[in-house]
Amino acid sequence: MYLLPLYEPLRLIEEVAMLDQLSGGRLELGVGRGVSPYELRNFGVDPENSRAMFDEALAVLLAGLTQERLSFAGAHYQYRDVPIELHPLQQPYPPLWYPTHTPTSIEYAGRHGFNFVGLGPAAAVREHTDAYKRAWSAHRHDPDRLNGHVATPKIGILRLVVVADRDTDAEAAARSAHQVWFRSITQLWHEHDDHSIDGLFSWETAIQHKSIIFGSPDRVRGEMQRVATESGCNYVVCSFAWGTLSREQSMRSLDLFASDVMPAFATG
């Protein structure tokens, strides 16, 4: 996931092409403009300019991934006949992902057919996925949409996951991990005496919204099914290594998920 206003586009072109080559064409490319005004300002970016910078940086990135020489004249970035020596293995470029929760950005993602991932309660994400699908349906045949090489976009929802042999063990691990995860998410805001996002990421909110899914394989399987059904998504993005979870806990969680949860969702 690259916050484009924080990167020099020409260097990013080279990094993306190299990553796709090294991974054998398995790179999935997430792009965004950033949601924290404090983070943007730390990099010398005016939050008011982040939308325009994102649009220009994305145009430069995609041009550089698909052309032999790069020329671009914008308000924020300018390049003149720059040779591009390395290109991605996937053509024309790796599939694009766009995480968002604002109506305008959701329409933008759907219009271009970006793979999309939403946050928050499944019911709220359902509104977003419905809006995405409307935009996608209206623009799927547009010749100039940016993710045109992706025939069926992934419409995802993000969840933090802990699977253990017993429900109580999974809950204890999730509670402990969440304390540090919460501090890391809110730290920069708190340094500016801003607590406006605390409620979005509290343990109580996570339980209410099912943004953290924990339990035995049976419990997690049921929760995953409910999330997928209620959200209208066709893809669930799971994070197994977060907060203070040890490598052993994360690997055990992932193993249980793969062996005892995923088979229930096999499609053929």
Predicted regions and their residues:
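Active-site-adjacent structural elements that line small-molecule/cofactor binding pockets in enzymes
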Residues: 1-268
